[in-house]
Amino acid sequence: MRIANIRLTKEEKKMKRTDQEKKKPSPGELVHIMIDRPMNSYHPEHKDLFYPVNYGYIEGIIAPDGEEQDVYVLGIDHPVKEFTGKVIAIIHRLNDVEDKWVAVPEDMTMTAQEIMEQVRFQEQYFETEIEMLE
C-alpha cells in the first residue's frame, strides 16, 4: 500500500474555506463541547505542547480537515470534561485548512486581543485572523 503526501493548492484551500464558512456559527450560538485536551494538559502527540486552556470539539460538526470542529474554551479557570457555552469568534488559519472556534460562558465577552493572548501557545505557528461574531 502506498501513502501519498497530499498538499492543498491555494485554490483548494480557498474552496475548503468557502465550504467551512457555510458552517459558521451564529453570533452567540450555544454549543456543547467535548473536551479532549483539558486545561493544564499536554498534546497527545506533540508532548512539548502545553494547553493552558480547555480545548475540544463539537460532535456532529465536521471541519474541512474531516475531523469534528475544534474549539478553544476560554473564560473558565479549571479543567473540564464537557462544556456548553456561546461561540464568540472564529480563528481563521490562513495557511491551513482548519479554523478554530472560540467559546466562552454565556455571560462573558472577550476582545480579539484577549482571545489571541490565550491561544497564542498554539496559534503562534500559523498565520491567523480572528473573526469576532458579536
Please name every model-derived segment:
Residues 3-134:
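Hydrophobic N-terminal alpha-helices or hydrophobic patches in metabolic proteins across all domains
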